[in-house]
Every structure is written in structure tokens, then in C-alpha cells.
Amino acid sequence: MSKNLLIELGLEELPAYVVTPSEKQLGERLATFLTENRLSFEDIQTFSTPRRLAVRVSGLADQQTDLTEDFKGPAKKIALDADGNFSKAAQGFVRGKGLTTDAIEFREVKGEEYVYVTKHEAGKPAKEVLLGVTEVLSAMTFPVSMHWANNSFEYIRPVHTLTVLLNDEALELDFLDIHSGRVSRGHRFLGTETTITSADSYEADLRSQFVIADAKERQEMIVEQIKAIEAAQGVQVDIDADLLNEVLNLVEFPTAFMGSFDAKYLDVPEEVLVTSMKNHQRYFVVRDQEGHLMPNFVSVRNGNDQAIENVIKGNEKVLVARLEDGEFFWREDQKLQIADLVAKLTNVTFHEKIGSLAEHMDRTRVIAASLAKEANLSAEEVTAVDRAAQIYKFDLLTGMVGEFDELQGIMGEKYARLAGEDAAVATAIREHYLPDAAGGALPETKVGAVLALADKLDTLLSFFSVGLIPSGSNDPYALRRATQGIVRILDHFGWRIPMDKLVDSLYDLSFDSLTYANKADVMNFIRARVDKMMGKAVPKDIREAVLESSTFVVPEMLAAAEALVKASHTENYKPAVESLSRAFNLAEKADASVQVDPSLFENEQENTLFAAIQGLTLAGSAAQQLEQVFALSPVINDFFDNTMVMAEDQALKNNRLAILSDLVSKAKAIAAFNQLNTK
């Protein structure tokens, strides 16, 4: 008869950002534990609040399934001695399986007999197996962990309670310094310790103590309450998904309310107000029906609506202090001069091993000038790029960015406009940070895109040059994100800038502040980001073939990968790739100094292939270029069918290899076709 299992771990307040992934991890690890221990189940439901992680298993088998395993041992000729008795090898084999030689039988495998034994293991009661379930809790991993009291172990937060129930029976287990029971803790202020009656009564038992254990239910409550406020007040509330997820992991019993602030603060830039409310106070932003910011906010209390007016006043008071700071910095920063702030950047460290921000900007300016030419920017855009590169970090020394660092670039744009800078320059100051997250928004202007590329390129080359190279998951300077941004920007704008040649040219530059180094590592790092950009939807062999193409032009590489994926589902893909692969492999033996000499052709097939290669222009889209190369497949096959490439005559052999080398030099602009798998 099946049963229901409940496991709850009660902890000190968890950081909001770890609650959801930890809840998911607990469910996945328990499912793995049960499967590996042959305990079948129907369903797993997970729960979480800031002070607990829990999981309930429904339809859990009351006993393990029996296990029958066959084990293959040594060959019969080794298992028996000259007298036909079992050898030490056979005896040792069965002993290792906990059996005797009586269990041995011989089975034929591919014409030879081998020792086989069959081991039967009766399933244990679920209750006995579950005594080892604490290994699930011990195996959990967290971004950070801590020690407490005098304990030698560490965990995400101190553990206070452990509840393990099989239906209504409490299992006795020990985890860290806690002995399990059926006592859980209610809401920190509104509830008390409570007894969990059974696995099925878990949510109801906690609800009576003002705890909503199901995160999805808490989220629904928050959204419904906000919608009710919208309807009652005639407003729109920005229900930001990330903020919603954070807030629901800060509360156990949510109650939403709306507060207000003086409308005078609306004269401060909207970004400052939104940052103050959303990022610093975890408030939802309120707008009117036209989308204009209103002097209101919505917050979520961890509790009921008792004395809610006092709660509203307290939150308003805290927010006003933030808004006062914002208003002050907005007013005072406008008194500053951009030139003065830029001059002070010589005293601001970019990194102690690399130099100052001013030096970083100087290098960025040189790189930006080179990129502007490669991207064919207009004269006006080139001028804007140069001016932006001279000043684009000035806002880091403003009071506003010092207080609200999330506004770097955003305030730079606003202050630059107020100072009379060209609109393109001001926009570029904001856009150079983009994209600021995986999948984040990209620069919309060419000037901003070039500045963003230049800034990211110098950052990448500078850190690599001093040996600060990401390893494993460790990337403290966000170089992967910066490089992914480079790849995305190049693809978005369709700039056909050969990255290998560009990086070579940057390494030829000379700066007093820094000498670029570790070029090979930089190129491999960029290739890895292009590989990631192609994504798992592109098979590994296609990604590798494209990454080995002769032209490191990001938009073309990504387009080639897409074209190859589509072509791989067509009938002519396999024969075309196989003929090209054969040509690629043979071309590796060619003498690079040998030029094709048509006077050495001995058959029409040589002449036909050479003419086809000469006429191969690789024009149009990646798909069209691939079609042009694939169209050569019959000509290539005809050449191989009628021509001995590796002829004994050295001149003929070299000439024929040179023909194939010419083919490869053109086709490799798309991909290294011999890296493609057709099996």
C-alpha cells in the first residue's frame, strides 16, 4: 500500500535569491534518491518560504522493488583449473558479489563461455530505506554557506527543525545537530510552533500559523492583491517578474498595500525613482492609465493587514529618505563640469594590475576609432564616437551614481544632454554598457554599439594580458558576459569585421599604460562565446566545422551554422559533405607553394573541376553560398572517379592536390566540411 512522505527543513531566513533554486534542487535530489533506491512514487510537490524548504512525495511505495542482477565474470577457461575445479579467479569473483561458487553458470558470448552469476536482493521496507534520506539534505549545494555555534559543519543557514513524516508517522533521523520530529515553526510574528499532523495536512497546519508554504500560491495571492489595488485605485502597477519572484521569497504570509510620496519628487528622473523603489525598497512602481509615473508605490508586507496604516507610514518614511537623496544628488550633480570629472578619472583605478579608468578610456578611444572605420560609420558618427570615448565614464564620479550604481550610463546620458553634448554622444554613454545581462537589450545606435564594442574589447584584452582569465565557473570580472556582448552586437548590426584580423591589429597597437598579451587565449575565448551563441540547437559537429572556417566573421559564422542545420535535413547533404570532406582531407597534403598548372591536366574532369572552382564566387546569403558549394559535389565525385590524385608522377600529384587546395580555400570560408558528421 502506498504512502505519502513529507520532509521539511526549518532554517533561519534564507537569502531570497536562493529559495526557489533550493526548493527545486531538493525535489530533484529526493526524486533521484528514491529512484536509485528502487522506491516508486506517483508525484513530488515542493514547498518553500524564507524559513523552510519542504517536499512531499505522493504514492510512495511501502517497499523497494526486488532486484535481480546478472554479473559477467571471467572466461570459462580462466574460471576452471586443469582438474575442472573453480579457480581462485572464479572464487574471488563470486565472493565479491556475496555469493558462492554454487551460483555459477556458464553462458556463451560471441563463441566463448563466461562465468555468470545471478544475484537476488529482496526489497526493504520504505521506512528502513528512508533512514538514509538525510544524505539528500547533506548533498545540497548553495552559493554560500556558513558555520554556526561551535559546529564544524556548514550549511546555507542554521537549521532549527527537521520534520520527516510517512503518512502520520514521524521518522526519527538526525541531520547536523538536529533530531527530527513533527514540530514546525509558524510565522515569526503571527504564529507559534506547531505540530504537523500528517504529510497530507502540511499546508493546512502551517496556514493556521500564518504560513503559506506553497510559493505558487503566495505568488498568486500577491498578484491578486495587486490587481485588486489597481481596480480600486484606477492605476497600473508594474508587476516586474524578477521583483515578484524576490518578494514572494521574502514573505510567508503576503499582504499588499499602496503607499504614496510627495509629487515634487516626480521632477527627479524617473530612473532614479524606479531604482529607489524597485531595487532598494523592493516596491512595485505605480503608473496612471497613460503609463506616467505616479507618486505611489505598492509593497508587500510579511503578515496580515493588522495595523496596516502604521506599516504604510513606515514604508513611506523610508522611501522619502531615499528620494531626498536622489533629489539632492540630481540637483548638485548638475553643478559639476564633465571635463573636471574626466580629469579626476586618472585617480580612479580600473584594476590594480591594469591601471586607471582614464587609461582604459584612452585605449578604448583608439580601438573605437579603428572599429568606426571597419563599420563604415559616417563622418558625423566617427566624430560622435571619438567624443563619447573621451568622456563616457565621467558619471562614475557623480553623487547620483555613487549612491545608485545601477544608474551608471543612464545618468551619464542625462547629464551629458544637460551639458549640451550631442545627442548621439549622450546616447552612446548609456548604450556602451549594453548588453548588461544575458539576453539583455543591445545598443540601438551605431555610435553606441561601436563604443560598447571598444570598451568590451579593451576590458577583455586588458584582463587577459595580466593573467586574469576566467577558469571554470569563476568569472569575477564578467568577461564572458562582455565577450558574449561583443558577439551579439556584431551579429545584430551585421558588421562583417574579421575578428582574427581585428584582434591582430589591436595587438599591434602600442600603449604606455599596458601591453596586450595572451592573444591565443583571447581568440579561443571569443570562439567559445561564438560557440555558445550558436546554441545547443546546432549539433556539435556543425559548430566545430563553422568555428574552424577560414573567415572569423561573426554574422557569417552564425548564418553558416543555421544554413548547415537546415541543409542537414535534406537528401543531398550526406553525399555533398562526404565528397567535400574527401577533398578537404586530401588537400591537407598539398604543397602550399604549388600553383595549379592547367597544362598538366590529363583528363576533362580535372579541367571541369578547376573551371567550377574558378567560377565559385560564394555570393548571396549563407544558404545560397552553401548551395553553390554543394552543387560542386557531382563534379568533385566525377574528378575522384576518373583521376588518381596521389599519382606516382610528383608533378601530377602536386597539381591535383593544388586543385583540391583551391577548392578548400574557397569552401572553408563557410566551414571545415571534413569536421561534419554524416553517420
From Swiss-Prot:
User: EC annotation?
Assistant: 6.1.1.14
The yes or no answer to whether the keyword Cytoplasm is present is: yes
One GO cellular component term = cytosol
* GO biological-process terms attached to the record: arginyl-tRNA aminoacylation; glycyl-tRNA aminoacylation
What top-level class of enzyme does the UniProt entry assign? Answer: ligase
A molecular function annotated in GO for this UniProt entry is: arginine-tRNA ligase activity
Return the Pfam families for the record.
Answer: DALR_1 (PF05746), tRNA_synt_2f (PF02092)
Give the catalysed reaction(s), semicolon-separated: tRNA(Gly) + glycine + ATP = glycyl-tRNA(Gly) + AMP + diphosphate
Which controlled-vocabulary keywords does the entry list?
A: Aminoacyl-tRNA synthetase, ATP-binding, Cytoplasm, Ligase, Nucleotide-binding, Protein biosynthesis
What are the subcellular locations of this protein? Cytoplasm
Q: Which domain of life is it from?
A: Bacteria
Q: Which SUPFAM superfamilies match?
A: HD-domain/PDEase-like (SSF109604)
This protein's record includes keyword Transferase: no
The annotated subunit structure for this chain is: Tetramer of two alpha and two beta subunits.
Q: Which family does it belong to?
A: Belongs to the class-II aminoacyl-tRNA synthetase family.
What is the name listed in the Swiss-Prot or TrEMBL entry for this protein? Answer: Glycine--tRNA ligase beta subunit
